[in-house]
A protein has these predicted regions:
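Acidic, low-complexity Ser/Thr/Gly/Pro-rich repeat segments typical of extracellular/periplasmic
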Residues: 32-298
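C-terminal subdomain of alpha/beta-hydrolase-fold enzymes, centered on the catalytic histidine
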Residues: 159, 342, 425-432, 494-694
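C-terminal motif of bacterial Sec signal peptides marking the signal peptidase cleavage site
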Residues: 26-27
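Short, solvent-exposed loop/turn and secondary-structure capping segments
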Residues: 108-112, 135-138, 170-173, 184-201, ...
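Domain-level recognition of soluble alpha/beta enzyme cores
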Residues: 270-333
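Primarily recognizes the serine-hydrolase "nucleophile elbow" in alpha/beta-hydrolase
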Residues: 449-511
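Cap/lid segment of the alpha/beta-hydrolase catalytic domain
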Residues: 298-321, 333-458
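N-terminal secretory signal peptides that target proteins for export/translocation
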Residues: 1-11
Length: 694
């Protein structure tokens, strides 16, 4: 009898015996058309699909193995993901890898996104959470597949983006690929480990060399999908790919921040003074000490984060002197006080823009005509504004930094808000803005102003004050983002007016143009080390997925979507009017579309005569929203929610149409007039500033 002494086997003989066993253990498949599913010993970032709950430990996401791990972006963002427990964002791309032998069927590229929202679709994203109100729902999708490997992605990587209504937080989803996805559908055999999981079995039963704990974990992760398949009596043998993941709750970050800050008592403002008057309103000015929550030195090359105490309340580091403005309409104040429009300026803006920012003429001069204060005053509304964090007023206070920034044409301190080099600071720059505006609003609503400051207005009591029951919030550009987040986290706004509006995220840097300079191309080339256009032209790119994992807590669409998805988790939803322009070089279409979809905005009136790729209407229709024609009121479950769109005027770009045209000014003026009268606001066909609404 021959007995082999394992301790004396030649190394080459050991290799011969061990290699097949190791290959089996890691799931090395004989069929190169299968989904790549490495339950044990991952082989590449996408070898279990992504996102997947195989990488989710109580909302702490394992991003180990992300491509190009030593590249600065990858290194910075993966480290930041690992520090937090926000979980998977509902707004990120999805990935599934197949073997090199599988070819996507030719007809997949011809399918409309809405055709994927079907139980017969070759690729499906399904809500499989039995506690979800959308259980069983399928979503419109954008689908693509890599044909060759690149710096970030392997060959045959299926890439999917849900493009309809947003996915929910704290909800379990599955991405399922059916046999018809493959060009050679009849020949494709599913991965046996995947089949076992979909049948509710432990994959160890088909591959006993998997690590037992990994196999048991995989069975647990796939159990909701196995139960869904059994309940729906679906054919497991037709499923050639599947991933399961549970979204996290990143929106809790800003909600918690506002909930705590709104309980603080703001320090009183300095004495109010009459600054100037127009025919429609008086301008009052003061100063206020705004709390600074971020630690470190501006512009936050490092640090820039907010710390929280044991009660989850943000820690105040210091204060900043902020100029503040109130405008009083030259009218008789209602008994409850003037209705008030809280205005948030945009990037590089000033508190005074609430009354100074009107029409820009061809020679570059700017008048007060059509300013928010004028539009509001004509309808009986007061306005208020503050100098925001990193805005132009703030920049002037930082003398040395201001001197340096003056040497860079078109660049301001406020542009450092989008500090993609330090994403925690980018997130918390937005959080700081939201926090200080929350507290400033509380200050304003407690004011009693001597009516002698505006003799042409009548108070009836000797003091001006503001009606807590009639408040709206308006913002331009970055201000539209803070305004939207304010309305979605702080109670009491009956209206939201967002202009030049969109999402907050990495796209604000990558899609940005500064004059004739393509800032995004420079970032791609220098920071991401890819050819310009590689990331910006490809919304499936893994850079977007990783960035969203870090910046999701500041993604305002996750907040505004609550008004439709989970109204019990948000303040009462306001009426919403959005004004967009073409071409907007600052808040571009990839940032506008998900924001508008999250609101449930219908498209008002005619779409612009631009290529379909530059339109908004098709994307809103994919999400289930409509094109309506003015007058429109109460179109979204009794609320008015709509977007109007204008072509640029030839003087300013489309980003500024609200200030360049009387039509949108007429529209949002009537929106405010209706709110003040307690009516459901109507979005009309705009014409002349200040003219009648009916």
């Amino acid at each position: 009898m021959l007995i082999l002494n394992s301790g004396r086997w030649p190394a080459s003989l050991k290799f011969v015996f061990v290699l097949p066993l190791f290959a089996l253990a890691v799931g090395c498949n004989a069929n190169d058309q299968e989904m790549v599913l490495k339950i044990s010993w991952r082989d590449g970032f996408f070898s279990q699909g992504f996102p997947t709950d195989l990488r989710n430990d109580d909302n702490r996401i394992d991003v180990g193995g992300f491509p190009r791990p030593l590249q600065l972006f990858s290194l910075t963002y993966t480290r930041q993901v690992e520090q937090y427990d926000f979980g998977y964002s509902p707004a990120m791309p999805l990935y599934m890898q197949f073997g090199s032998g599988l070819a996507m069927a030719e007809h997949i590229d011809t399918l409309n996104p809405t055709e994927f929202a079907s139980e017969l679709a070759p690729v499906q994203v399904i809500d499989i959470d039995p506690d979800s109100p959308d259980y069983g729902a399928r979503y419109p999708l954008a689908v693509a597949m890599t044909t060759e490997a690149d710096q970030y992605r392997p060959q045959n990587l299926l890439q999917v983006r849900p493009v309809g209504k947003p996915l929910r937080e704290n909800t379990t989803y599955a991405m399922v690929v059916l046999r018809d996805f493959a060009g050679n559908a009849a020949e494709v055999e599913p991965n046996p480990e995947l089949t076992a999981l979909l049948e509710g079995r432990n994959p160890w039963s088909v591959n006993p060399l998997l690590l037992w704990t990994d196999a048991a974990r995989a069975r647990q992760v796939y159990a909701p999908l196995a139960e869904f398949i059994a309940a729906q009596d679906l054919a497991v043998g037709d499923v050639i790919g599947a991933t399961v993941w549970t979204t996290g709750n990143p929106s809790r970050y800003l909600k918690n921040l506002v909930a705590n800050v709104s309980q603080w008592q703001p320090v009183p403002a300095d004495a109010w003074l009459l600054r100037e008057e127009t025919a429609d309103y008086c301008v009052l000015e003061s100063k206020w000490e705004a709390p600074v929550l971020q630690k470190g030195a501006i512009p936050f090359v490092t640090a820039g984060t907010i710390d929280f105490d044991d009660q989850s309340s943000p820690v105040i580091r210091r204060t900043r002197t902020a100029p503040i403005i109130v405008t009083i309409p030259k009218q008789t104040m209602p008994a409850a006080g003037f209705p008030v429009l809280h205005y948030h300026h945009g990037t590089g803006g000033l508190a005074t823009q609430v009354f100074e920012r009107g029409l820009t003429a061809a020679d570059g001069s700017q008048s007060y005509l059509g300013s928010p204060a004028q539009v509001a005053a004509q309808r009986g509304w007061a306005t208020t504004a503050m100098a925001g964090h990193l805005g132009a007023d703030h920049q002037e206070q930082l003398r040395l930094l201001d001197t340096v920034l003056e040497l860079i044409p078109g660049f301001t301190l406020n542009h450092t808000t989008y500090n993609f080099l330090n994403p925690k600071a980018m997130r918390d720059n937005f959080a700081q803005m939201l926090a200080e505006r929350t507290l400033y609003r509380k200050l304003v609503m407690s004011l009693s102003l001597d009516d002698s400051l505006c003799a042409a207005a009548v108070s009836g009591s000797g003091e001006f004050h503001f009606d807590t029951g009639h408040q709206a919030v308006m913002g331009q550009s970055l201000g539209s983002m803070t305004a939207s987040a304010s309305a979605a986290t702080d109670q009491g706004y009956s209206g939201l007016i967002a202009t030049g509006a969109g999402n907050y995220g990495l796209g604000l840097a990558l899609f940005y143009s500064l004059g004739e300079s393509d800032v995004g191309a420079l970032i791609e080339n220098v920071y991401l080390n890819v050819e310009p256009g590689t990331v910006t032209s490809d919304l499936f790119h893994p850079v977007w997925a990783l960035a969203e994992l870090v910046l999701a807590p500041a993604n305002i669409s996750l907040l505004t979507s609550k008004w439709l998805q989970a109204p019990e988790q948000a303040p009462p939803a306001p009426h919403v009017m959005v004004v967009e322009g073409h071409y907007d070089e600052q808040v571009t279409l990839p940032m506008q579309r998900p924001y508008l979809i999250s609101l449930g905005a219908d498209f008002m009136n005619e779409e612009l005569d631009v290529p379909e790729s530059s339109q908004l209407l098709p994307d809103l229709q994919i999400a289930g929203y409509e094109q309506l024609f003015s007058p429109v009121a109460g179109n979204r479950d009794g609320r008015t929610v709509g977007v109007v769109r204008y072509e640029e005027d030839g003087i300013m770009t489309g980003h500024h149409v609200t200030f360049q045209y009387p039509a949108p000014q007429h529209q949002y003026g009537c929106f405010l007039e209706d709110l003040a009268q307690g009516l459901t606001p109507t979005i009309i066909v705009g014409s002349v500033l200040g003219s009648a609404c009916r």
